[in-house]
Swiss-Prot record:
Its main location: membrane. Residues 60-70, 162-195, 295-299, 407-418 are extracellular. GO terms for biological process: detection of chemical stimulus involved in sensory perception of smell; signal transduction. Expressed in olfactory sensory neurons in the antenna. Keywords: Cell membrane, Glycoprotein, Membrane, Olfaction, Receptor, Sensory transduction, Transducer, Transmembrane, Transmembrane helix. Glycans are attached at residue 69. It is found in: Cell membrane. The lineage of its organism: Eukaryota, Metazoa, Ecdysozoa, Arthropoda, Hexapoda. GO terms for molecular function: ionotropic olfactory receptor activity; odorant binding; olfactory receptor activity. This is Odorant receptor 13a. Residues 1-38, 92-140, 217-273, 321-385 are cytoplasmic. It comes from Drosophila melanogaster.
Amino acid sequence: MFYSYPYKALSFPIQCVWLKLNGSWPLTESSRPWRSQSLLATAYIVWAWYVIASVGITISYQTAFLLNNLSDIIITTENCCTTFMGVLNFVRLIHLRLNQRKFRQLIENFSYEIWIPNSSKNNVAAECRRRMVTFSIMTSLLACLIIMYCVLPLVEIFFGPAFDAQNKPFPYKMIFPYDAQSSWIRYVMTYIFTSYAGICVVTTLFAEDTILGFFITYTCGQFHLLHQRIAGLFAGSNAELAESIQLERLKRIVEKHNNIISFAKRLEDFFNPILLANLMISSVLICMVGFQIVTGKNMFIGDYVKFIIYISSALSQLYVLCENGDALIKQSTLTAQILYECQWEGSDRIEIQSFTPTTKRIRNQIWFMILCSQQPVRITAFKFSTLSLQSFTAILSTSISYFTLLRSVYFDDEKKLD
């Protein structure tokens, strides 16, 4: 039923299982219900829309609470932390559901052009796997976060100092259009419904970020392999066959370079909306979580731990993505330097014979490649911002500015009340 990529040795990170569980993984062409009337495919699509609906409904409950408590800056900022994360991943879920064909084509293109098998006789695949460890750390932090949101209210119920049967806690601050406290059945069903919506939000966040990082990491790996091929461009060709061999090698290098650039553009095109929403919301989220940690009064110790994990996971998620985007920029621009250093200028020093001299035709092609390679390959958020460490520092700077402003407003209000 699920789309099976052409290259059988391709294995995605374990986090991607959650995209299948949340209904976001593309199905095969033959599994489409309007073509083969597959009951499993139909059930899967219905499940996918149920997940989206449950997240949307939970966000509406949180928004109702937010609007009802706008006058309290502490409650507002606390609620914004979960509401904004929900909105971000609600957008992600809808984007993945509405762009299944693009997602399928992206996976297919990756399997043919970018994937580096683990059995490859080079250390590039091992380096790519090593770089993916950072996404496991990010996943662990986010998993701890949602577990704390779902478990801490239960700890409060069973081990808290005082239990109010009419004001039982939920994973997040919400207002319902019905009385969720009227009976234990209603409470339990509402708790399970909203908790699972939160699980879908967090798992979609780390699963989609992981697959984006997976694509970028192996694209960087392909640039590394390309650099190795460029370094050996003029090795082992005799004088009679020099030009023909060099031209053939250069042709394959150009084709591979174009394929890598083409995949990076498809990757950017697919993840554009998600990255834009992520970068816009991240600065606000980091600001508000930091504000909660600094200004929280009479807060349960578990809530402090929860917010510390929250800000750690938000920072790690943003840093890992920006660092991978920065690595792609560096690897792509390094191509020009590798081309320049590949001994293409040998024809002016034929007497040295330390390597096969190049013809003017080959030099012209290499010069053109150097010119093209000076333009970095990068992933942007609709061209508004580039995924790079520079963007990461800019977002942190913006978050600190928001935090300073919010803190000033809060303490000014405190002084007026005193």
